């Protein structure tokens, strides 16, 4: 990747991890890389709103507004974003289980550290989080109402990230 595509070593390393050694998948990921910055911002605003929403009815409105914003995007972008979320939760779990060598994501969003988020992703909630994200992706693929699907997912995430 570094020689053929003329990219930086840290980006090549990240893409090599994500593609699991598959060169064709790495090229696809390289082309999608420019789309990821808004994904990071959306992810951070989503999990922050989900944290605040526990026992705070006013913060539920933030989740609904977030859902409406993401629902306004195309279905393919929504699916890519949900895949990105699965990767982020996986990275947080790896950090929580003290395997930093396997963590390849570097957040570019100011004032958000994956290390601080990691303790909220554990063995008690990760399977449910993955299931809910996968179900949401499935329903979006089947032309479900994205606003309803994402609002439901957001409320479930609020419950799941506080699960000990």
Residue ranges and their predicted role:
Residues 1-84, 95-106, 110-164:
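Charged, glycine-rich active-site and insertion segments that engage polyanionic ligands
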């Amino acid at each position: 990747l570094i020689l053929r595509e003329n990219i930086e070593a840290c980006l090549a390393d990240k893409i090599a991890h994500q593609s699991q050694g598959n060169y064709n998948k790495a090229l696809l990921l390289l082309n999608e890389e420019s789309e990821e910055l808004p994904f990071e911002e959306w992810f951070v605003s989503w999990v922050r709103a989900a944290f605040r929403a526990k026992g705070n009815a006013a913060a539920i409105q933030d989740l609904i507004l977030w859902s409406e914003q993401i629902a306004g995007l195309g279905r393919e972008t929504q699916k890519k974003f949900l895949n990105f979320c699965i990767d982020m939760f996986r990275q947080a779990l790896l950090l929580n289980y003290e395997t930093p060598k396997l963590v390849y994501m570097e957040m570019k969003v100011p004032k958000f550290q994956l290390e601080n988020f990691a303790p909220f992703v554990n063995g008690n909630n990760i399977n449910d989080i993955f299931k809910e994200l996968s179900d949401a992706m499935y329903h979006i693929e089947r032309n479900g109402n994205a606003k309803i699907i994402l609002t439901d997912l957001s409320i479930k995430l609020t419950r799941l990230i506080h699960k000990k």
